[in-house]
Amino acid sequence: MCGILAVLGCSDPSRAKRVRVLELSRRLKHRGPEWSGLHQHGDCYLAQQRLAIVDPASGDQPLFNEDNPSIVTVNGEIYNHEDLRKQLSNHTFRTGSDCDVIAHLYEEYGEDFVDMLDGIFSFVPLDTRDNSYIVARDAIGVTSLYIGWGLDGSVWISSEMKGLNDDCEHFECFPPGHLYSSKDSGFRRWYNPSWYSEAIPSAPYDPLALRHAFEKAVVKRLMTDVPFGVLLSGGLDSSLVASITSRYLATTKAAEQWGSKLHSFCVGLEGSPDLKAGKEVADYLGTVHHEFTFTVQDGIDAIEDVIYHVETYDVTSIRASTPMFLMSRKIKSLGVKWVISGEGSDEIFGGYLYFHKAPNKEEFHEETCRKIKALHQYDCQRANKSTYAWGLEARVPFLDKAFINVAMNIDPENKMIKRDEGRIEKYILRKAFDDEENPYLPKHILYRQKEQFSDGVGYSWIDGLKAHAAKHVTDKMMLNAGNIFPHNTPNTKEAYYYRMIFERFFPQNSARLTVPGGPTVACSTAKAVEWDAAWSNNLDPSGRAALGVHDSAYENHNKVNKTVEFEKIIPLEAAPVELAIQG
């Protein structure tokens, strides 16, 4: 994939404007370090920084169709591009890139082709005959995208906020599953699945149908001409992804080029739950496993870079992004260009521990719908930007359109967590892969309790962040938090600390409005906090905030903030700085 920047309909076609667009495009170079391209057509500029995954030798982007009326700058992976090429048999393609089909589809079908694409994408095709264009983003928002408007009437599009925040009067997140058309200067939703209305589905649970749908989602993402690996924390989601990948890798074109031995990667503090579980799964599957350890101080030292790259002040996103950011640097240094990861399962199946308190199947289902619709501001943003900070791509099969349709049409009564019946979180997913004759995973891994990524890398990671923030944010500062930050006012010192850093990089009001807010417990939406009255006194995105559910739950709110006791255990000043790489 890539980093894209488009400036459309600007009033200044001068050389200075072209230089400025190039300068802004270079802010995205970490996303695509292998090729820089810029095409100007009148008052429109299309720029691209390319990370080559499919047909890397083709190079040149933005992409054109055969006689040049359509030009496209695109960040994406189109998994059904070979089938689409067959439908476009009257067209001549210049490259073997999967994204080459987009310009041709735009010429052939106009604005009505987006739903034909099976993949993840953000793109801007420009018709040079009349300077019309559309902008589109994938169904769930796996790829990041922003839209802004200049005082001169120009429309700006960028993969990251840093590409447009200094030059736009107003900007915002481009909504997932939508397209923007220059012909009516407005948005419309192209992604219209049945679950989007939040109506309660009634389809019976079919374990084999669910299993086969997910296997297809994983296998289609093995499309590659470059080395890749799998992120393996040892939790259910990443372990299933690794298991399926290792089973089917030998049958793919990727195995012919790079061998059938799968490389897996895990990160954590020394002795963390994820490192232990990840190694156990890797040994079971026979992967070439790489463990990356970091210290609390390593993570703290990276916080400013993480906030700059991930472009958020959301507490849970920063907690989870930091280990992923550190791991991505190491993975890229090994020559790997993309990884397959397990984001999205918890939203689809109600895997977060607070779902234990869902009062009925209706509220359970409505919460999963809310969580999926918000993914682009949380886990998708984290997975996309913390990896792309180092030119590494993350693919997420749980967010496959076809798989989501299967999973979200199951009667939610089957997803409800019922301990007295032995049904833990994500039970129907676990059961679908519980194969006695040809097991995908060891039983205790298949039924391991949910760990949020920021918890699984080591519980002292979050405790260390809180202790560090307490050194930099005083009680007096917290008293004035509402005056300093009236929007999404931070209610903890940790949140205040992140907000200060974010505002230094992105001081515009539009920037702070791109970050979600509201009360949360264990990553819930604000609505789900109402499920348990006790949660309102223990608001924290960590899974350990789900009192009475998590095996290592916080005993009470005061225990969370015992900074002095924590520093007796791990003196932050003495923590080593170097990242250790093992295996």
From Swiss-Prot:
Q: What InterPro entries does its record include? A: Asn_synth_AEB, Asn_synthase, Asn_Synthetase, AsnB_N, GATase_2_dom, Ntn_hydrolases_N, Rossmann-like_a/b/a_fold
Domain Asparagine synthetase per the UniProt entry, residue ranges: 237-516
Locate the Glutamine amidotransferase type-2 domain: which residues? 2-185
Q: Name a GO molecular-function annotation.
A: asparagine synthase (glutamine-hydrolyzing) activity
| The reaction(s) this protein catalyses | L-aspartate + L-glutamine + ATP + H2O = L-asparagine + L-glutamate + AMP + diphosphate + H(+)
Which pathway does this polypeptide act in?
A: Amino-acid biosynthesis; L-asparagine biosynthesis; L-asparagine from L-aspartate (L-Gln route): step 1/1
The answer to whether UniProt assigns keyword Nucleotide-binding to this entry is yes
Q: Which residues are L-glutamine-binding?
A: R50, L51, A52, I53, V54, N75, G76, E77, D98
- Please list the GO biological process terms of this entry: L-asparagine biosynthetic process
Q: Which organism is it from?
A: Pisum sativum (Garden pea)
First-level EC class: ligase
Q: Describe how expression is induced or repressed.
A: By darkness.
E.C. code:
6.3.5.4
Tissue pattern of expression reads: Roots.
- Any Pfam family from its record, for instance, is GATase_7
Descriptive protein name: Asparagine synthetase, root [glutamine-hydrolyzing]
Keyword Ligase listed? The answer is yes
Q: Which residues bind ATP?
A: L231, V267, S341, G342
Superkingdom field: Eukaryota
